[in-house]
A protein has these predicted regions:
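Conserved nucleotide-sensing/catalytic segment adjacent to the nucleotide-binding pocket
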Residues: 1-43
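Short glycine-/polar-rich loops that comprise or flank the Walker A/P-loop
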Residues: 12-14, 38-43, 90-93, 165, ...
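Conserved GTP-binding G-domain of TRAFAC-class P-loop NTPases and closely related GTPase folds
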Residues: 49-110
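Active-site neighborhood of divalent metal-dependent phosphoester bond hydrolases
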Residues: 65, 70-73, 162-164, 176-253, ...
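N-terminal active-site segment of His-dependent metallophosphoesterases
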Residues: 104-184
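Divalent metal-coordination and catalytic microenvironments
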Residues: 129, 172, 187, 201-202, ...
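Active-site environment of divalent metal-dependent phosphoester hydrolases
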Residues: 132-135, 175-178, 204-208, 267-268, ...
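Acidic, His/Gly-rich catalytic cores of divalent-metal-dependent hydrolytic chemistry
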Residues: 279, 283-378
């Protein structure tokens, strides 16, 4: 019954606290499994109190008065053995309260999940995949009403909107285009000043692994980005690495009415936190097949979407942004000679600027038609 109730609460997205002994690893494993099934992060709060306190409190309970002392002693031993294994078992955070005083004095404060920004209501300007097209990004921000802030060398390092609007980037800032460092400098500055949000794209994820010293294939424009970054100083590259590590998979905004991610996200994953959620948000899903160009066939999740929140994303280039079932893909192939597109929210107005040129030849032509109606609205 316990696990059934826990599963129902987690499925509904409700705070779930399990008050149980759970000193055996197998008992905890069932709860960790439930957390993973529902894409939430389990937290352990360990009450490590002296044996005599446990005995006194058990004696004061009518349903536990006859509990043998040896049972309490066994529980104590099992608890102590468990302290070093909880994180390896899958608990994201472990809090150990030692002694009755700590247990009595502790204050439990709920923290928002790092993707939960429902309290931010905008207005927002959601920007599609930039892919190193710094000049086009500056032009788009200007058209959206932002004033660029330049550093001592004349490089765009921030942007301010007179009406306090917030830019939200769907990821894939880098690769393929002529100035990935310039795009990073501008977006990092906007995020640092609180004037922008940014989620991770698959290209940031790959660049981050490279900067972390891991072996990755320098394909799909990464080689150009690495070459461009080599001309920057070490402090800038270190700042880029830190920035990428801090990017989350998606944001839930405006009271839950807007979800921004890189590759799309079904409703069951909104506000959830797991490797499965992050993978979908960064890469989307595929059918397991490849097309005539050797590229994976994308699973058409948006065709089945019926969620309340509008999902705005990028990742898959299309010649024109169009709404489909309250989802909108903003990747209009700027680096391939298309456009750089933004969505004004809550106005649901599309704003775009043309690419200055074809910066990178696509593996296959952009799709002939974008999702949604001709007016770009649902």
């Amino acid at each position: 019954v316990l696990h059934f109730i826990v599963g129902k609460r987690l499925a509904a997205g409700r705070l779930t606290v399990v008050d149980a002994t759970n000193v055996q690893a197998e008992s905890r494993a069932q709860l960790v499994r439930l957390a993973r099934e529902h894409d939430v992060l389990p937290v352990a709060i360990v009450l490590d109190v002296p044996e005599h306190v446990c005995a006194e409190r058990n004696a004061a309970r009518a349903d536990r008065a006859g509990l043998p002392r040896r049972v309490i002693q066994r529980h104590q031993r099992e608890l102590r053995r468990s302290l070093g294994t909880l994180e390896r078992e899958g608990f994201r955070t472990v809090h150990v309260l030692r002694g009755a005083r700590e247990v009595e004095d502790v204050e439990v404060v709920r923290e928002r999940r790092f993707n939960d920004l429902r309290h931010l209501t905008g207005p927002f300007d959601v920007v599609g995949d930039v892919h190193g097209c710094r000049a086009e990004l500056e032009t788009l921000l200007d058209r959206l009403g932002y004033a660029l802030v330049r550093d001592a060398e004349g490089r765009a390092a921030d942007a301010v909107h007179p009406e306090g609007r917030t830019a939200v980037f769907v990821g894939d800032l880098v690769d393929r285009g002529p100035d990935s460092p310039g795009v990073l400098r501008l977006v990092m500055g906007m995020v640092a000043s609180g004037r922008a949000l940014c989620v991770s794209g698959n290209h940031e994820n790959k660049l981050g692994r490279h900067l972390d010293g891991r072996t990755v294939q320098h394909t799909h424009g990464l080689a150009e980005t690495v070459e461009q970054l080599a001309k920057e100083d070490e402090a800038f590259r270190a700042g880029v690495a830190t920035f990428i590590k801090g990017l989350v998979s998606h944001y839930v905004l405006d009271g839950g009415a807007l979800v921004v991610c890189h590759a799309g996200l079904p409703e069951k994953y909104h506000g959830r936190t797991s490797g499965r959620v992050r993978s979908f948000a960064l890469y989307g899903d595929t059918t397991g097949e490849t097309d005539e160009f050797g590229l994976p066939v994308r699973y058409p999740w948006a065709e089945e979407y019926r969620g309340r929140a509008a999902v705005v994303y990028g990742h898959t280039p299309t010649p024109r942004a169009g709404w489909l079932n309250n989802t909108l893909c903003l990747d209009t192939g700027c680096t391939f000679g298309g456009k750089l597109t933004a969505l004004r929210w809550p106005e649901r107005e599309l704003v775009d600027v043309p690419a200055e040129r074809v910066w990178y030849e696509p593996t296959k032509p952009l799709a002939a038609e974008a999702p949604g109606g001709a007016d770009g609205r649902p």
